[in-house]
Design a protein with these regions (language model features):
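An acidic-aromatic
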Residues: 77-135
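Gly/Pro-enriched, hydrophobic low-complexity segments
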Residues: 150-257
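Beta-strand-dominated lipid-handling architectures at cellular/organellar boundaries
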Residues: 56, 67-73, 79, 185
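Sec-dependent bacterial lipoprotein signal peptides
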Residues: 1-18
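Hydrophobic lipid-interacting interfaces of membrane-associated proteins
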Residues: 58-64, 89-92, 106, 111, ...
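N-terminal leader/targeting segments and the immediate start of mature chains
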Residues: 18-69, 111, 234, 241, ...
Length: 257
């Protein structure tokens, strides 16, 4: 059973093209620029509020020792609900991760294996190295990493930066192109209606680098989502697995001797 589950996770790992070069960050001396905060507020109007969001996601890049390619169907609802389905070429999904903020389930339909009550961030960390909870992932994907406060700075004529605690949002020529968010480097591109359709996430981790690009399509925000969207029907006979089992299949796990 464990071998089958490992195969399901491995099905998400495949050769893919290298990620595109990221936009550079500004360098040099900064000047105070309170207007940068208002500029950011104006171009991220969809974030206030970002009550719900759905999108199809094509994920590519590298996680640890593995190249990654996956197709996901995603749904999010504030404050901490999510649904991620990793689609297979045919038949049932490779996996389904759901959480309503209180209860979290990871289900492998093909193997009928289930992990219950592990934190969302721990599950995503084991699968991809992206250790974010549902709320942080929603904000990161849709470019809502900074609120309405913060300190505005300007670098030269093109760059504006908004700092808010440990988060920095980078605007180039009035467009949100990057962010440093809770230790993650994020690059945004291909905006439509202010929402980025290409999101690159990078971080150097002790077990290897993470460099993933999420390409978003069919994006809808603030639509009504039924609470059932954040649950999954698990057959009574599904075999229970542990977070340690999942970590053993992680692309960041040490290779077997």
């Amino acid at each position: 059973m464990i071998a089958a589950r490992l195969a399901a996770v491995a099905a998400l790992m495949a050769a893919t093209a290298c990620a595109a070069r990221a936009p550079e960050r500004p360098v040099g001396a900064a000047a105070e620029a309170p207007d940068a905060v208002q500029t950011l507020i104006g171009i991220t109007a969809h974030c206030r509020p970002l009550r719900t969001a759905t999108a199809e996601i094509r994920l590519s890049g590298r996680a640890g020792r593995e190249r990654v390619r996956a197709r996901l169907v995603s749904g999010f609802a504030a404050p901490a609900s999510l649904r991620l389905e990793a689609l297979a070429p045919f038949g049932p999904p490779a996996l389904v991760l759901v959480s309503d903020g209180a209860n979290t389930t990871l289900f492998f339909p093909r193997e009928e294996q289930v992990l219950r009550e592990a934190p969302v961030a721990a599950v995503l960390d084991a699968l991809t190295g992206l250790a974010l909870d549902a709320s942080d992932l929603r904000r990161l994907l849709f470019g809502c990493v900074v609120g309405e406060g913060g300190r505005g700075l300007r670098y030269g004529s093109a760059w504006q930066v908004v700092e808010d605690g440990d988060t920095r949002a980078f605007l180039k020529n009035g467009v949100l192109v990057a962010a440093d968010y809770r230790g993650w480097q994020v690059d945004y591109a291909a905006h439509q209606g202010g929402i980025p359709r290409s999101v690159r996430v990078r971080r150097a981790l002790p077990a290897g680098a993470l460099d993933l690009v999420a390409t978003l399509a069919s994006v809808e925000i603030n639509v009504d989502l039924d609470a059932a969207a954040f649950t999954v029907a698990v057959p009574p006979g599904a075999a229970a697995i542990t977070l340690d089992d999942l970590r053993a299949a992680s692309p960041f796990a040490p290779p077997a001797p």
